[in-house]
Amino acid sequence: MTPTQAAVAALKGRTNLINATTAELRKLLEEADRQILAILAAAPSDYQLWYLPQLQAEIRRVLVTLGSEAAGAVDVRQLEAWRTGAALVDQVVAAAGVRVVLPTLDVRQLTAMRAFLTGKIKDVALDVANAINSQLGLVVIGAQTPFEAIKAISALLKEATLKRGTTIVRTELARAYATANQIRMEQAAAVVPGLRKRWVKSGKREPRVTHVAIHGQEQPVAKPFVLEGGAVTMMYPHDPKAPARHTI
């Protein structure tokens, strides 16, 4: 396998990892939707008989479980993304015929990233719980029918929450991958003189125009990529120090 083939295979593996994680998130949200609809179906048909605190508590339990399970799932995948990002450097260097023994990555940054991601995922679940409470409240005061509330709640889970969760997962898994990749390259550069990195545009259907513009740009490992005519610099894709428009 050539260095280019090794890099292409690793990037494909990263994409598959992210897609598998978002699919897992979708399954968890669909299960939460089923459980919440079952709770609402068991409520009295006359909404005036609804005991709102009990309904809210039951739904909140479902969503707290969702948050914990989703956080656990993405945490495992984030670790895998971190390892894969580091392994890419090892594979490319080996494919070039260079034999090096590199130290284990310092995981302090990974630890912070894991805490951030699991916290964000749990926040998503709690935010949707509050939004659902608002929908139930509208029913109780007669502002909408139970049927309308059920439709709105399903939309919250299957559309808005899924979209937000997917954005977080894609961003943070890609960031873990790229961060580990950069750290590993810095280690390798200490023993492989002249090692350089290259910006490769993403495989998205609609990639950022500014990222497409620097496709193929090469820099020494310790130097940043230059975007927007020098107005923006990034050490790697999803660099947390870069403006949000370039990372989310």
Residue ranges and their predicted role:
Residues 159-163, 178-179:
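Secretory-pathway/luminal and periplasmic proteins that interact with or process carbohydrate-rich
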Residues 1-160:
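N-terminal leader/targeting and assembly helices and adjacent pre-domain segments
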